Amino acid sequence: MEKISLRIGLVLLLLFAFNEAKAQWSVSYFGNSSNSKVGVGYDFSEKLWAELRIYSDLPLYDITVEGSLNYNFVRRDQYRTYVGLGMVLNEINGIFLPLGVQVSPFENLRNFSFHIELQIIEVFDYNDTYLNGYWGLRYRF
């Protein structure tokens, strides 16, 4: 349990290492045919943001978390594209590169968006590389 707490603490430290007045919080859901995750995001600026995600459908003693630092390389009113670097800990241990698009199709609900994300993940436990795709929802506060 101490090892898990240390890992979660490290991810939280990386997630909140930077602080800026223009910060904005968000919540998200990611899913595919294999698993799902829920996340909490924090925008440090218009370009840089971080997210902490927790995998669902796992026992509480075996919670898997992933944290990522992301960069919006295209940001428009109706969509954003981003790339990032992250790590996943516990059930799966490794690093990943997310590449995604967030689309806000409703003009009167700009805080709500749909997203798709492609992840390349290097899993240290299996010494293998995987390609995962996710879809989901995001709401910014």
Where are these predicted regions, by residue range?
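Residues that define the transmembrane beta-barrel architecture of outer-membrane proteins
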Residues: N32-V38, Y61-V65, Y79, E91-L97, ...
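Short loop/turn motifs that connect adjacent beta-strands in outer-membrane beta-barrel proteins
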Residues: A21-A23, K47, V74-T81, F106-F112, ...
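Residues on the lipid-exposed face of transmembrane beta-strands in outer-membrane beta-barrel proteins
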Residues: V38-Y42, G67-Y71, L85-M87, L97-V103, ...
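Short glycine/proline- and aromatic-enriched beta-strand/turn motifs that initiate or cap beta-hairpins
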Residues: A21-G67
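Transmembrane beta-strands of outer-membrane beta-barrel proteins
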Residues: W25-Y29, L48-L52, Y79-L85, L97, ...
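Sequence/structural signature of outer-membrane beta-barrel proteins
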Residues: S34-S36, Y55-P59, N72-R76, V88-I92, ...
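Transmembrane beta-barrel domains of bacterial outer-membrane proteins
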Residues: A50-S56, D62-L69, Y79-L89, S113, ...
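Cleavable N-terminal export/targeting peptides
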Residues: M1-Q24
